[in-house]
C-alpha cells in the first residue's frame, strides 16, 4: 500500500468483486475533492464477502490508513489498524501489511499521547522484522524518533547505533551513514563532543567512499556538512566555520542541478532519504542566516532570511510537514535579533507575535521554543528600556530551558539588565559567578565566553574600576577578533573608547571610537552608532575640533531621531502588551496601547 492508495497486490487480485470494490474505493479517494465517506463504504463492503485472512488484514489496514489520513475519527482508525496488526502476524510472508500496520498504529498512538502503547508495539515489530531490511531500518528510525521527542536521547542513540550496525551487516553503507549521522546529531544535542568527533570523522569517510545515486550521495554530504557547521556555530567559532559553510553552499547548488529521477536501489535497505531537496535548500539558508547573525553581517542575514521565508511559504502551500514550521520559527528568531540590533524594534515585535501565532498551532513547537520566545521578549524589553519586564522575561526563560548555551546567553543578558539598574548587586554578583569566563565557564562556546568578558568589563566600568574593565575588554577583543565576532568587537571598542575618554586620554579614545563607528556602520548596529557618535562629538569638542564635533553631533541627532521614532511606533503597537506575558501559552488577542508608556531616557 503506497501512502493511502487503495490497491490490490497480485496474490489477492483473483476475486472480481474485490477488484471492483477496490477500484471504486480508489476512485472516490482520488476524486477532487476526495469522497472519503464513499471510499470507506466500499472498503467496508469487502467484509460482507467473508474474504480470506490476507484480504481481511489488508482491508483493515487500508481502512485504518484512509481514516487516519483523511478524517478525525482516530478511534475507528485505531480499531482497524489494531485488527490489521493482529491478523497479519498470523499470516506467513505478509511483511508489507504487517509492518505498515505496526508503523501507522504506533504513529496514531503517539498522536493520541499513548506513547506507552507505541513503544512495545514498535519493539515487537523491530524484533520480528530482522529478515526484512527496509522495514527493520524504518522501524528503528521510528522508535529512535519517538525517544528523541520524549527527550530520551540516550535510548535514541542506542537504537541508531543498532541500526548502523545492522545496515553494515546487510551491506547498506548509505543507510549506515544515515543512522550514524542521525546519532551524531543527537550527540551534538547532548553536548557529548568527545563522542561526536570520531563519529563525524567516520561519517566523512563513509560518505566520500560511497558510490551510488548522485542525489543520495550529495544529500548525505549536506547532512554531514550541516552537522559540522552547526557544531562550529554552537562553539561560537564564526571564522573557523567558513570553509565548511562554503562547501555546504556548493553542495546544495550541486543538488539543485541534479535530476530528481526515481531512486530504485538494488538493496532494499537503501530506500531512504534524509530530507527532500527543497527542505535541504531552506536548511542551508537557515544555517547561513545563523552564521551571518553571529558574525554580525546583518544585511546578509536579512537577505537569506527573505529568500528562505519565500521558499517556505511556497512549500507550506503543498506540504504540511512540521519541520517547515520549525524552520520558519528558527529563521524568525534570528531575524528578530537582527532587527533589534539594526533599530527596527516595531518590526521585531510584529515578528515575535508571528512566532507566537505559529506556536499556538503546535503544542510541541511551543514546548521547544517557549524559552527562546521569552528570551526574545526580554531582548525587546531591553531595547525599549522596560527593565522590570526584561527581568521577568529572562527569569521565565531560565525556568523553561534545559539548554546550556541558551541558559548562558540568558544569564549574560540578565546580568546586563542588573548592571543598568544599578541597585541589584547581590543578584548580579551571583549571576557573574555562574558565568565566570576565567573559571569553570559553563559552555564551550567561544562567542559566549567572549560576551561574558564584555559583561565583566561593563560592570567594572560602571563601578569606576577602569584598569580592571580594560583587562576584561581586551580579552573580549582578542577573542572576538580571533573569530570575526564583529558586534562584540564594536561594543568592546566603543566601551574602551569611553573609558579612555573618562581618563582624559583623548587620543587613545579616538583610536578606539573611530573603528567602532566604522564597524557599527558596517553591521549596522544602531545603539553602537548612537554611542560612538555621542563620544565622537564630546571628543572633538574637548580637542577643539568644532567642525568634526558639529558633524558628529548631527549624526548623533539623526540616530536619536530614528531610534526615537521606532521606539514610539513599537510601544504603540498592541503587540507591545506581550512584554507582560510570563506564564502559559502566548496570548492571541492584544489590546491596543494609547501610546508609549516607557521611558525614552536611555535613547537620548
Curated annotation (Swiss-Prot):
GO biological process: cell division; chromosome segregation; maintenance of mitotic sister chromatid cohesion; mitotic sister chromatid cohesion
Keyword presence, Disulfide bond: no
Keywords assigned: Cell cycle, Cell division, Chromosome partition, Mitosis, Nucleus, Repeat, TPR repeat
UniProt xrefs under Gene3D superfamilies: Tetratricopeptide repeat domain
Extent of the TPR repeats: 99-132, 371-404, 450-483, 490-523
Subcellular location: Nucleus, Nucleoplasm
Domain of life: Eukaryota
Primary location group: nucleus
Effect of inactivating the gene: Early embryos exhibit numerous developmental defects including shortening of the A-P axis, ventralization, and defects in neural, somite, head, eye, and tail development.
Annotated GO CC locations: chromatin; nucleoplasm; nucleus; Scc2-Scc4 cohesin loading complex; SMC loading complex
Family to which this protein belongs: Belongs to the SCC4/mau-2 family.
Record's function text: Plays an important role in the loading of the cohesin complex on to DNA. Plays a role in sister chromatid cohesion and normal progression through prometaphase.
Subunit text: Interacts with nipbl to form the cohesin loading complex.
Protein name from the UniProt record: MAU2 chromatid cohesion factor homolog
Source species: Xenopus tropicalis
Amino acid at each position: 500500500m503506497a501512502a493511502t492508495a487503495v490497491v490490490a497486490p497480485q496474490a489477492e487480485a483473483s476475486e472480481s468483486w474485490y477488484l471492483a470494490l477496490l477500484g471504486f474505493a480508489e476512485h472516490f479517494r482520488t476524486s477532487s475533492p476526495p469522497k472519503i465517506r464513499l471510499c470507506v463504504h466500499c472498503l467496508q463492503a469487502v467484509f460482507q464477502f467473508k474474504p480470506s485472512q490476507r484480504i481481511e488484514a489488508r482491508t483493515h489496514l487500508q481502512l485504518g490508513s484512509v481514516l487516519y489520513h483523511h478524517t478525525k475519527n482516530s478511534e475507528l482508525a485505531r480499531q482497524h489498524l489494531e485488527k490489521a496488526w493482529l491478523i497479519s502476524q498470523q499470516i506467513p510472508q505478509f511483511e508489507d501489511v504487517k509492518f505498515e500496520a505496526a508503523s501507522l498504529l504506533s504513529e496514531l498512538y503517539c498522536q493520541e499521547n499513548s506513547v506507552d502503547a507505541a513503544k512495545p508495539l514498535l519493539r515487537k515489530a523491530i524484533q520480528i522484522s530482522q529478515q526484512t531490511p527496509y522495514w527493520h531500518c524504518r522501524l528503528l528510525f521510528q522508535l529512535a524518533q519517538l525517544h528523541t521527542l520524549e527527550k530520551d536521547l540516550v535510548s535514541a542513540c542506542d537504537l541508531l547505533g543498532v541500526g548502523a550496525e545492522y545496515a553494515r551487516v546487510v551491506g547498506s553503507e548509505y543507510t549506515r551513514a544515515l543512522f550514524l549521522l542521525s546519532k551524531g546529531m543527537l550527540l551534538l544535542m547532548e553536548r557529548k563532543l568527545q563522542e561526536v568527533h570520531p563519529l563525524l570523522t567516520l561519517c566523512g569517510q563513509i560518505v566520500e567512499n560511497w558510490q551510488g545515486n548522485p542525489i543520495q550521495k550529495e544529500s548525505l554530504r549536506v547532512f554531514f556538512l550541516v552537522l559540522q557547521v552547526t557544531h562550529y556555530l554552537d562553539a561560537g567559532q564564526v571564522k573557523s566555520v567558513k570553509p565548511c559553510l562554503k562547501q555546504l553552499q556548493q553542495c546544495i547548488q550541486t543538488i539543485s542541478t541534479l535530476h530528481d529521477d526515481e531512486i530504485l536501489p538494488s538493496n532494499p535497505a537503501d530506500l531512504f532519504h534524509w530530507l527532500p531537496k527543497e527542505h535541504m535548500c531552506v536548511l542551508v539558508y537557515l544555517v547561513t542566516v545563523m552564521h551571518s547573525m553571529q558574525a554580525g553581517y546583518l544585511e546578509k542575514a536579512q537577505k537569506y532570511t527573505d529568500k528562505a521565508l519565500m521558499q517556505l511559504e511556497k512549500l507550506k502551500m503543498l506540504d504540511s510537514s512540521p519541520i517547515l514550521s520549525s524552520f520558519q520559527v528558527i529563521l524568525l528568531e534570528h531575524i528578530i535579533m537582527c532587527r533589534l540590533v539594526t533599530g527596527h524594534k516595531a518590526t521585531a515585535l510584529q515578528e515575535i507575535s508571528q512566532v507566537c501565532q505559529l506556536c499556538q498551532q503546535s503544542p510541541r513547537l511551543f514546548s521547544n521554543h517557549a524559552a527562546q520566545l521569552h528570551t526574545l521578549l526580554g531582548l525587546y524589553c531591553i531595547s525599549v528600556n522596560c527593565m522590570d519586564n526584561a527581568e521577568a522575561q529572562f527569569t521565565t526563560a531560565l525556568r523553561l530551558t534545559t539548554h546550556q548555551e541558551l541558559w548562558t546567553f540568558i544569564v549574560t543578558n540578565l546580568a546586563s539588565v542588573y548592571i543598568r539598574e544599578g541597585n541589584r548587586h547581590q543578584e548580579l554578583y551571583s549571576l557573574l559567578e555562574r558565568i565566570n569566563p576565567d573559571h569553570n565557564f559553563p559552555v564551550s562556546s567561544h562567542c559566549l565566553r567572549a560576551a561574558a568578558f564584555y559583561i565583566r568589563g561593563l560592570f567594572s566600568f560602571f563601578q569606576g574600576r577602569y584598569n580592571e574593565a580594560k583587562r576584561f575588554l581586551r580579552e573580549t577583543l582578542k577573542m572576538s577578533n580571533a573569530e570575526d565576532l564583529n558586534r562584540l568587537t564594536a561594543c568592546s571598542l566603543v566601551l574602551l573608547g569611553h573609558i579612555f575618554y573618562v581618563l582624559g586620554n583623548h587620543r587613545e579614545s579616538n583610536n578606539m571610537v573611530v573603528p567602532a563607528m566604522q564597524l557599527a556602520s558596517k553591521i549596522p548596529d544602531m545603539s553602537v552608532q548612537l554611542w560612538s557618535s555621542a563620544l565622537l562629538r564630546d571628543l572633538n569638542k574637548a580637542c577643539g575640533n568644532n567642525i568634526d564635533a558639529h558633524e558628529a553631533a548631527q549624526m548623533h541627532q539623526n540616530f536619536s531621531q530614528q531610534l526615537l521614532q521606532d521606539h514610539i511606533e513599537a510601544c504603540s503597537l498592541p503587540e507591545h502588551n506581550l512584554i507582560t506575558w510570563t506564564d502559559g501559552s502566548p496570548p492571541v488577542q492584544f489590546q491596543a496601547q494609547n501610546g508609549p508608556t516607557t521611558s525614552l531616557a536611555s535613547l537620548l
